[in-house]
């Protein structure tokens, strides 16, 4: 039984959006992540893709095997008998090294001023938090995470930058993220991780929606050393739970 209200909305002629309450909520999103796995398993023959997001679950089905109305009835029946698997909700926690050097953290001063903090205090606050991955998207391997502490939840730039370096660690309001490739972007950049977040030769990132990220501070020497190891495939991401 699901304790959240939800609606079904058509997504083209071969898709369904299951839409949950409009909020950024970890418990709600964990239900969405779990449903994605269970629906993928239960209806594997009829569906082609399942895409979880902040508050929606999009299911694409094979129109040769079912119709929108038939599949809606099946989903309603499935959801009415849904039982949570708490083990799946736990996720894994990854430790991500971040260099907060001023060359990398180009918005550190502004975000510190926004939060009435010193840069040192900002780094401590940012790195002590655990960030939940709500969804992957926008770019291959881009992590949409929350929840950024209110004190430093500075809105995104009014005018996006034309280029953000790969590995940039950023915030935008209550959201946190890591840029996997060079890209335009309007989020506030606090630092940079030396690890490769996406490469075409390894298209699947090590973490996924439902996991957690814990940042920890490194200096420039450590950044260079880890980057060298990572370039040769010798750096192992630390998983501290899950």
Predicted regions and their residues:
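Glycine-rich active-site loops that engage anionic ligands at enzyme catalytic sites
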Residues: 1-242
């Amino acid at each position: 039984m699901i304790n959240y209200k939800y609606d079904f909305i058509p997504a083209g002629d071969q898709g369904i959006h299951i839409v949950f309450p409009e909020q950024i909520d970890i418990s709600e999103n964990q239900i969405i992540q779990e449903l994605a796995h269970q629906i993928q398993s239960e209806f594997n023959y009829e569906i082609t893709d399942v895409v979880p997001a902040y508050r929606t679950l999009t299911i694409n089905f094979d129109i040769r095997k079912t119709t929108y109305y038939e599949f809606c009835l099946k989903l309603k029946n499935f959801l009415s008998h849904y039982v949570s698997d708490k083990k799946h909700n736990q996720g894994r926690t990854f430790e991500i090294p971040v260099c907060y050097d001023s060359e990398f953290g180009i918005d550190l001063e502004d975000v510190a001023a926004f939060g009435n903090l010193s840069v040192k205090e900002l780094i401590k606050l940012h790195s002590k938090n655990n960030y939940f991955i709500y969804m992957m998207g926008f770019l291959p391997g881009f992590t949409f995470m929350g929840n950024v502490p209110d004190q430093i939840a500075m809105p995104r730039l009014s005018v996006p930058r034309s280029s953000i370096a790969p590995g940039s660690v950023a915030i935008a309001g209550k959201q946190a993220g890591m840029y996997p490739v060079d890209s335009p972007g309007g989020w506030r950049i606090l630092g940079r991780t030396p690890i490769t977040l996406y490469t075409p030769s390894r298209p699947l990132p090590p973490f996924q929606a439902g996991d957690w990220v814990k940042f920890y501070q490194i200096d420039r020497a450590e950044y260079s050393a880890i980057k060298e190891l990572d370039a040769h495939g010798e750096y192992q991401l630390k998983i501290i739970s899950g």
